[in-house]
Amino acid sequence: MMRSKEYAYFDDGYATGFRKNYTGGRYSFIALLPNEDVSLADYVKTLANTAPEKVVKMLTSPQSTSVQATMPKFGYDFELRLNDILIALGLSDAFNASKANLSKLGKCSDGSNLYISEVLHKTHIEVDERGTKAGAVTSVAVNAEASMYPEEIKEVTLDRPFVYIIFDNETSTPIFIGSVTDIQK
């Protein structure tokens, strides 16, 4: 398990969590640990059924307090074939060799038609004491704020399934959203 002191705390009534800013401050890692009486599946449903602007407001308005964060190292790969999804959205001709019109992209020397044969979406995330690797991005930082008054230190120990988010702080947009279900201590 990795330990760090953070300064942004979340408590939405169903989960507690923290935000860990990366170098430069544009991106951050957010961990949300469902309360002991809330399953990960139920918490994910709660997030999915909450208006997006309310979720963004929660993620952009943490309590400014000390958080003792403890989390496992983890890594996941994900691959999704998008052909059927794109066809369902109306892009069926682009996948049909006889109907596709991709001539503005180029021409085959033998005169055959260009078409889309496969669209894959792959993600990779790895979090350890050296930082986070998500796609081709690697960076990590700990921000510290000086406090003149003693404050209560919140504690979040990610020792059961939790939700994580790689968040773009400038655009208030989640870049990656996932869950860790196998906790390796």
Short names for language-model regions:
Residues 1-185:
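Secretory/exported precursors with cleavable N-terminal leaders
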